[in-house]
């Protein structure tokens, strides 16, 4: 067995100019609420949602948003069923999203009472100048709505998180007034939202530092801080990692589904936290987690999707394959998993796969033949190698088997 720590120099931890300050945080899964708001996403059956809650729990996720109770009677009934499903789980707790409207809050209260489960109520309101201008909102009216909604939920005995939408484009003065009022009314968790995917990692850090030091600290209250990100600029995962430096809980969705181009990908976030040594848990349930969401939400997984796509641990390139094959011939799976992969396949319960195509070397052909029970004769190798070089793609196992002929 190789000592991989001595074979890989990790510039991510070098520290001479920049030092990652990521931390282990709580995780909130938004797949069953914000994730389902994606315009191309289908609403999965209730039994699938229940299974997803169990997988989230298996993955060590701390909480899950199970819907908008104020949306309809059907939505509220689904929330009741899902909240009841969490009762037997080891870790996962339910929450739901409500507008800062009394009717929405009452729907959350009713759902919690019917389920017999305290459902964390996440009361949200837009906060940025552009949103306020578009809506013709006055700050005094917004503050009145916040006071009514938060006080109502707190009085009913529900844990409350107060959320501002578009926080990453809102001015400090407005944010200070909205959050401070919510805390004074009893909210014990606040959430910053990058609703339109505007933020960079620097912006996330600046915003969370402001909320921690200039909003929460002066209240002297014990208040936790959440971060909710979107992926419009392709920065969802790195922003979420940056948020862990200061946030108590970070949000994400399976496969990054959600509004427009989606949310932070929870699966990718978990893989990165694992690789940084910030979570120590079995990540093999991620395979079923993303497969269920893909199948029942109608979201195809791209072949090149990080860690979980079909091509994540697959190569037909001669140079790459040769290195992996040599590691496998040393009977060193860990070495094979890392020599040409930044994410070990074994973390996901997967394996490196050697294919044969136009970019392959002969070693690809020999490996494929031996691993599929064929004798690697010179004629067979040359026949397959010639066919691969003439092809414009990776050859399928069926095509290779036909070229290989009978096993001996």
Question: Which residue ranges define each predicted feature?
Answer:
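N-terminal capping/small domains of soluble enzymes
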Residues: 1-100, 353-356, 360, 371-372, ...
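A mid-to-C-terminal "edge-of-domain" accessory segment
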Residues: 2-33, 279-408
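Alpha/beta enzyme core
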Residues: 22, 27, 38, 43-62, ...
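Hydrophobic alpha-helical scaffolding
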Residues: 42, 68-72, 94, 98, ...
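Conserved active-site and cofactor/substrate-binding residues in soluble primary-metabolism enzymes
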Residues: 44-47, 51, 73-77, 103, ...
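Catalytic alpha/beta core domains of metabolic enzymes, predominantly
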Residues: 199-331
């Amino acid at each position: 067995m190789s000592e991989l720590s001595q074979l890989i120099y990790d510039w991510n931890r070098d520290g001479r100019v920049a030092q990652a300050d990521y931390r282990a945080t709580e995780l909130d899964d938004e797949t069953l609420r914000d994730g389902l708001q994606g315009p191309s996403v289908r609403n999965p059956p209730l039994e699938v949602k229940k299974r997803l809650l169990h997988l989230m729990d298996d993955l060590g996720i701390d909480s899950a948003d199970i819907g908008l109770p104020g949306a309809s009677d059907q939505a509220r009934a689904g929330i009741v069923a899902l909240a009841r499903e969490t009762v037997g789980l080891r870790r996962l707790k339910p929450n739901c999203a409500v507008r800062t409207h009394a009717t929405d809050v009452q729907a959350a209260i009713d759902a919690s009472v019917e389920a017999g489960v305290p459902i964390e109520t996440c009361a949200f309101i837009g906060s940025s100048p552009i949103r306020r201008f578009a809506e013709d909102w006055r700050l005094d009216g917004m503050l009145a709505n916040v006071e009514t909604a938060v006080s109502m939920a707190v009085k009913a005995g529900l844990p409350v998180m107060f959320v501002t939408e578009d926080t990453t484009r809102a001015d400090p003065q407005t944010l200070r007034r909205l959050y401070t009022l919510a805390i004074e009314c009893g909210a014990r968790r606040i959430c910053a939202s990058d609703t339109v995917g505007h933020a960079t990692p620097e912006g996330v850090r600046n915003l969370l530092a402001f909320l921690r030091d200039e909003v929460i600290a002066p209240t002297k209250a014990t208040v936790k801080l959440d971060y909710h990100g979107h992926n419009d600029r392709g920065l969802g995962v790195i922003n979420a990692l940056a948020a862990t430096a200061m946030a108590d809980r970070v949000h994400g969705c399976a496969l990054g589904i959600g509004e427009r181009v989606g949310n932070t990908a929870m699966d990718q976030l978990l893989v990165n936290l694992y690789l940084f040594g910030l979570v120590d848990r079995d990540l093999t349930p991620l395979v079923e987690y993303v497969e269920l969401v893909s199948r029942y939400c109608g979201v195809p997984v791209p072949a090149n999707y990080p860690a979980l796509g079909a091509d994540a641990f697959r190569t037909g390139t001669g140079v790459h394959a040769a290195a992996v094959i040599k590691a496998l011939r040393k009977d060193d799976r860990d070495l094979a998993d890392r020599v040409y992969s930044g994410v070990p396949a074994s973390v996901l319960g997967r394996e490196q796969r050697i294919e044969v195509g136009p970019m392959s070397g002969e070693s690809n052909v020999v490996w494929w033949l031996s691993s599929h029970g064929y004798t690697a004769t010179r004629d067979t190798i040359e026949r397959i190698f010639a066919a691969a070089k003439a092809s414009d793609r990776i050859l399928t196992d069926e095509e290779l088997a036909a070229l290989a002929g009978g096993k001996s």
